[in-house]
Amino acid sequence: MKLSEIAEFLSLEYKGEDIEISALNSLLKANFAELTYCDGEKNTKDIPHTGAAAILVSKEYENLVPKDTKVLITQSPHLSFAFLSKLFAKPLINTAKEKVQNIAKSARIMPNVYIGDNVNIGENVIIMAGAYIGDNVSIGDESIIHPNVVIYNDTKIGKKCHLLANCVIGSDGFGYAHNKNGEHYKIYHNGNVILEDFVEVGACTTIDRAVFDSTIIKAGTKVDNLVQIGHNCNIGQNCIIVAQTGISGSSELGRNVIMGGQSATSGHLKIGDFSTIAARGGVSKNLEGGRVYGGFPIMLQKDWLKLQAKIAMKFKKD
């Protein structure tokens, strides 16, 4: 799509050299054929380092844009990006008349399973009744897909993974831009989900696809039932994520992190290796590894327990 066509679609002024835009991408990962955007002051430090062909940016940050990057000035880069994401969204349904599939002879596929185009299914894989396997999905050797699992397009699943009933892998993340009237506009997600080897995902758990790149669950991690993992998350090796945990978008967990039941994170933060978050702990900041945390606001679990004891004693005296 031509940059001039994008400008016209967004009702923005552009008089520079016309170039072809092939995709949308993040500030630091966009290349010379892609368009990016900067949606707030916290990201302005990355503008001078972008390799994008073009950028959506507000007037006040125009001077930070590299000289080789074309500029589209907009009052709301995030909202403009949301409108544009629909144009670049991948098709949800493949209309090809014939499907190309690579299914190992040893794989066992039960009745009422849908398998999309360009799907690779490894040796000794078991796919139980009612599962949905979207286009461009790969499933590694000896993985087991339980009844009614949904695996959306472009998902990559490693070897010896277990996906329990009704989990959903690769659905769109929860991302919206808002206008001045408070109306919400969907941001379409073109990334995917990668589950590395030996990952287990519990029943009715949901793992959202990334906006641009990949939501990654690294090898050996075990996820309980009824867990939500948001878009762009990176979950380290051998983590344990207990039931009803919610991990917000772009959170990073190091290796062997334990998230207790009903714990949660806010987005865009990091939890260090070998940390433990006690049940119902609410993480709202980066945490150093190797320690046990609890409560909200999050603190060392031992301090949280002391605080609860002091509060109890206070009320007992009164």
Swiss-Prot record:
UniProt-listed InterPro entries: Hexapep (IPR001451), Hexapep_transf_CS (IPR018357), LpxD (IPR007691), Trimer_LpxA-like_sf (IPR011004), UDP_GlcNAc_AcTrfase_non-rep (IPR020573)
Record GO biological process: lipid A biosynthetic process
Active site: 231 (proton acceptor)
Keyword Cytoplasm: no
Top-level enzyme category: transferase
UniProt keyword annotations, A-Z: Acyltransferase, Lipid A biosynthesis, Lipid biosynthesis, Lipid metabolism, Repeat, Transferase
Reactions catalysed: a UDP-3-O-[(3R)-3-hydroxyacyl]-alpha-D-glucosamine + a (3R)-hydroxyacyl-[ACP] = a UDP-2-N,3-O-bis[(3R)-3-hydroxyacyl]-alpha-D-glucosamine + holo-[ACP] + H(+)
Family matches, as CDD domains: LbH_LpxD (cd03352)
Entry EC no(s): 2.3.1.191
Pathway given in the UniProt record: Bacterial outer membrane biogenesis; LPS lipid A biosynthesis
A GO cellular component annotation in the UniProt record: membrane
GO MF terms, alphabetically ordered: N-acyltransferase activity
Keyword Repeat recorded: yes
UniProt xrefs under PANTHER family: UDP-3-O-ACYLGLUCOSAMINE N-ACYLTRANSFERASE, UDP-3-O-ACYLGLUCOSAMINE N-ACYLTRANSFERASE 1, MITOCHONDRIAL-RELATED
Family, as annotated: Belongs to the transferase hexapeptide repeat family. LpxD subfamily.
Function: Catalyzes the N-acylation of UDP-3-O-acylglucosamine using 3-hydroxyacyl-ACP as the acyl donor. Is involved in the biosynthesis of lipid A, a phosphorylated glycolipid that anchors the lipopolysaccharide to the outer membrane of the cell.
Assembly description: Homotrimer.
Name of protein: UDP-3-O-acylglucosamine N-acyltransferase
Organism listed in the record: Campylobacter jejuni subsp. doylei (strain ATCC BAA-1458 / RM4099 / 269.97)
Gene behind this protein: lpxD
